[in-house]
């Protein structure tokens, strides 16, 4: 547990340029506070002290606005940036050095027992407001765009965007436009553009037909 805590702190230092010192990180980063309290609650959970574990996780939720079930399994170097509104379910599994932004939900899609939450590989990034729902895997080095809704497996080294999410980048090769936390494709705007293109094509076809009709009338009048 101590090794994981040290790695969590180092991950904040490495990923956040605003982090200036270890003391500042320990005192002011609510995402780190939630992760540290999760580490403690998870230890109690593994000892089958479930009530104590859940009480600690609830205290963490009240303090930080981040809810991590103590039954979740999270690797080292986990960083929750900004943090508020993050929800991580009981059977979630998260690999090493993953990054999660505010408002993310790693949730289930049903009430059944057993595995019902996602598994994230190593070095996965999940953007702000994204929802990953179901017992499937998001592969190593994958990126989930802000506000995406992921309902099926994302292969390693891929980028997913949209509602429902689709792959836009695979193994370093662009499938569609690239994205980051700010510049991501807008599914509504893309659909609107597609409709405008179709309308423009129809207008051109109508114009050609009108010209042809005028020509036929002129020829018929001779």
Each language-model region and where it sits:
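A structural signal for small-residue-enriched, beta-sheet-centric alpha/beta enzyme cores
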Residues: 166, 170-178
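Terminal amphipathic alpha-helical/low-complexity segments used for targeting or macromolecular assembly
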Residues: 1-60, 175-222
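Structural signal for interior beta-strand "rungs" in well-ordered beta-sheet cores
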Residues: 61-168
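Solvent-exposed, flexible loop/coil residues
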Residues: 30-31, 36-39, 72, 78, ...
């Amino acid at each position: 547990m101590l090794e994981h805590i040290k790695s969590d702190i180092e991950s904040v230092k490495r990923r956040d340029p605003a982090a200036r010192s270890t003391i500042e990180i320990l005192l002011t980063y609510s995402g780190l506070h939630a992760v540290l309290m999760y580490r403690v609650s998870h230890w109690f959970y593994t000892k089958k002290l479930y009530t104590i574990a859940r009480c600690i996780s609830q205290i963490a939720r009240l303090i930080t606005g981040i809810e991590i079930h103590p039954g979740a399994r999270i690797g080292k170097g986990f960083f929750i940036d900004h943090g508020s509104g993050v929800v991580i379910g009981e059977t979630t599994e998260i690999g090493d050095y993953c990054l999660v932004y505010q408002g993310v939900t790693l949730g289930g899609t049903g009430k059944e027992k057993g595995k019902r939450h996602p598994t994230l590989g190593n070095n996965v990034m999940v953007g702000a407001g994204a929802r990953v729902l179901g017992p499937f895997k998001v592969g190593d080095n994958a990126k989930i765009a802000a506000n995406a809704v992921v309902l099926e497996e994302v292969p390693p080294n891929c980028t997913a965007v949209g509602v429902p999410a689709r792959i836009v980048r695979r193994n370093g090769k662009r499938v569609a436009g690239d994205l980051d936390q700010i510049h991501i494709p807008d599914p509504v705007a893309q659909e609107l553009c597609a409709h405008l293109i179709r309308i423009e094509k129809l207008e051109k076809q109508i114009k050609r037909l009108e010209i042809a009709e005028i020509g036929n009338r002129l020829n018929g009048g001779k």
